[in-house]
Curated annotation (Swiss-Prot):
Alphabetized Gene3D superfamilies for the sequence: Glycoprotein VP7, domain 1, Rotavirus outer-layer protein VP7, domain 2
Primary subcellular site in the record, as a coarse category: virion
One GO CC term, this protein: T=13 icosahedral viral capsid
Chain spans, region CNP motif: 165-167
Organism: Rotavirus A (isolate RVA/Equine/United Kingdom/L338/1988/G13P12[18]) (RV-A)
The protein, known as: Outer capsid glycoprotein VP7
Role: Calcium-binding protein that interacts with rotavirus cell receptors once the initial attachment by VP4 has been achieved. Rotavirus attachment and entry into the host cell probably involves multiple sequential contacts between the outer capsid proteins VP4 and VP7, and the cell receptors. Following entry into the host cell, low intracellular or intravesicular Ca(2+) concentration probably causes the calcium-stabilized VP7 trimers to dissociate from the virion. This step is probably necessary for the membrane-disrupting entry step and the release of VP4, which is locked onto the virion by VP7.
Protein family per UniProt: Belongs to the rotavirus VP7 family.
Length: 326
């Protein structure tokens, strides 16, 4: 009996020694593998690069104070700037290397060669309806035009903000605007818009719903119309549907990576004083018209101050994606 007990104890003791030895062996092997792996990582780390997915903090500021002509010390190595201008610029400058000249001048303000893009447009009205704004920062240069002098605030409103729009069936339905961010936007070759406000019994207020001649005319033969009526009141709408389309639009918010520079003479209507564009006045500037070279020199001088009141692109390469959605 004692022999069996001694044998059991001896077996247990030997098993314990073997288990302890096995664990220590595995521990030494794991330590060897881990330390070798860390050594390889340390050696290769300086040779590897990786993408840093950080958070883009918006650039904020105020342009209530006078602009200062400054040169940015650090380069905008990860930013792009698009400058949009009317196509008449090319013919007036008559210089095949004007873009290269401006690129070199932007370089003195901290914008590397290749980070500034020049894009021309033929018609500011068409451009504002479907703006293709591809850069981190976008500056739109708008020259004063007598044909569009009363539309410039509406154009600025379209460019500086993102809109969500849906088609309207004015032959079947009455429409009302819910708040100040709700507008009716009409576009086409010739838009004449008339409205008839309705009371709670759907009877015309100062007009007859059956006679469009009694409707109030809010726009005549225009290419772009942003109609703003009394909120919370149903309206019957009459429109030249053959040459114009109308959409019910909601302003989603500002395009904070877009700024407008208005170029004009002393008689130019100042859009920065318009109540429809007042919330964006810090992203609207005016340059008195002289020559296009003078305009561009001024833009180069003050580009960094303009950028400081803008926020870098954060949602889409194509701003039109947020414009007309059906």
């Amino acid at each position: 009996m004692y022999g069996i007990e001694y044998t059991t104890i001896l077996t247990f003791f030997v098993s314990f020694i073997i288990l302890d030895y096995t664990i220590k062996t595995l521990t030494r092997a794991m330590d060897f593998i881990i330390y070798r792996f860390l050594l390889v990582v340390v050696i290769l780390s300086p040779l590897l690069t990786a993408q840093n997915y950080g958070i883009n903090l918006p650039i904020t500021g105020s342009m209530d104070t006078a602009y200062a002509n400054s040169t940015q010390e650090e380069n905008f190595l990860v930013s792009t700037l698009c400058l949009y201008y009317p196509n008449e610029v090319v013919s007036e400058l008559n210089d095949d290397s004007w873009k290269n000249t401006l690129s070199q001048l932007f370089l003195t303000k901290g914008w590397p060669t290749g980070s500034v893009y020049f894009n021309e447009y033929s018609d500011i009205a068409s451009f504002s309806i479907n703006p293709q704004l591809y850069c981190d920062y976008n500056i739109v240069v708008v020259k004063y035009s007598t044909e569009l002098q009363l539309d410039i605030s509406e154009l600025a409103n379209l460019i500086l903000n993102e809109w969500l729009c849906n088609p309207m069936d004015i032959t079947l339905y009455y429409y009302q605007q819910t708040d100040e961010t709700n507008k009716w936007i009409s576009t086409g070759t010739s838009c004449t818009v008339k409205v008839c406000p309705l009371n709670t019994q759907t009877l015309g207020i100062g007009c007859l719903t059956t006679d469009t001649e009694t409707f109030e005319e809010v726009a005549t033969l225009e290419k772009l119309v942003i109609t703003d009526v009394v909120d919370g009141v149903n309206h019957k709408i009459n429109l030249t549907t053959a040459t114009c389309t109308i959409r019910n639009c909601k302003k989603l918010g500002p395009r904070e990576n877009v700024a407008i520079i208005q170029v004009g003479r002393s008689s130019t209507i100042d859009i920065t004083a318009d109540p429809t564009t007042m919330p964006q006045t810090e992203r609207m500037m005016r340059i008195n018209w002289k020559k296009w070279w003078q305009v561009f020199y001024t833009i180069v001088d003050y580009v960094n101050q303009i950028i400081q009141v803008m926020s870098k692109r954060s949602r889409s390469l194509d701003a039109a994606e947020f414009y007309y959605r059906v």
